[in-house]
Amino acid sequence: MKIIIAGAGAVGTHLAKLLSDEKQDIILMDENEEKLSKLDSNFDLMTVNASPTSISGLKNAGVAGADLFIGVMPEESRNMTACMLATNMGAKKTVARIDNYEYLLPKHKEFFSQLGVHSLIYPEMLAAKDIVDAIKMSWIRQWWEFCGGALVLIGTKMRETAEILNVPLHELGGRNIPFHIVAIKRGNETIIPRGDDVIKLHDIVYFTTTKKYIPYIRKITGKENYPDVRNVMIMGGSRIAVRTTQYVPDYMQVKIIENDINRCNRLTEVVDDKVMIINGDGRDMDLLMEEGLKNTEAFVALTDNSETNILACLAAKRMGVTKTVAEVENIDYISMAESLDIGTVINKKMIAASHIYQMTVSYTHLRAHETR
């Protein structure tokens, strides 16, 4: 299958790396030749140094024969334009990264499809949903769904209470166990486990299973005593914070700490009345204690500064908060943040790339089935 990715930024680059392992015909387009040259020599893909909104550039990339065209440039308008051009020049299906939630409303779907934009990806919304999934099951660090939710991949950290510590994997129940351990992260090392490998204290273990057996995995990993989240404190009134408040269950009480008074005023207009908006510096521990940090089960740091978010989560952990979530947009910081035991790390660019990857794999399988 021929796939053209427009934009060699963080989303496009991560997506190209994922898809290059799938042995597809991948073409990455960007105007920045330096970005492309770094990728061209390291991954199984082709690059085209041209603007994705240029008709001549799209022709050079062979868009007429593309099965899938994906616009993931930073600018929403360019992604939409590139997808419209690609469809009219012969691309079978298009996906555009957007920043406007209004475009996702069902009443607009047919309109955009007629224009040539078949699917829309809104990273802030995807990140918000991941955050809510993380705090609803506070003992899980990462959660991904596949095959329409029929299969899940979860990551959780091993503490002293885990029943499966120091047991060779081949002794965990053989073929009858309702899960498969697909990876173990030990420090900065990722292990693809074999039967004689053992799970050690502080490992992050990744399981594939079905939702039916999540309680069983919770039991064997010693997480049954983790408290349910009732109180959530969010540091930073970003767009992701707004979307997060819209997806949290009704039984959760949410507070947003925001330093900018103008943004606080705006937040009062766009979030539900049940959400408390507090004007103050989220780095001020005295303020956080006054606002009930010790009675908070989940602390979510969503400022535009990765370092601030990491440090704030570390501080919240030390104050006894069970679940912390940090937005880390600097990709170079992600592995460091994970090693600091701050809980769940969110990067909206990587989430968007992973979501598009899952869409692409599903579309690839569908196309293969249609051609049989």
Spans of model-derived segments:
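Hydrophobic, well-ordered beta-alpha structural blocks that scaffold small-molecule cofactor pockets
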Residues: 1-2, 8-22, 182-250, 256-262, ...
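Cytosolic Rossmann-like ligand/nucleotide-binding regulatory domains
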Residues: 2, 6, 29, 45-48, ...
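Cytosolic ligand/metal-binding cores
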Residues: 10-11, 15-136, 245, 251-363
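Short flexible coil/turn linkers enriched for glycine and charged/polar residues
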Residues: 74-75, 88, 115, 125, ...
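Glycine-rich beta-alpha junction loops
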Residues: 100-101, 125, 149-150, 160-162, ...
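Rossmann-like NAD(P)H-binding beta-loop-alpha module
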Residues: 130-151, 172-174
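Short, flexible, solvent-exposed loop/turn segments with mixed acidic/basic and small polar residues
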Residues: 141-147, 194-198, 367
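Conserved small/polar residues in nucleotide/adenosyl-binding loops
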Residues: 364-371
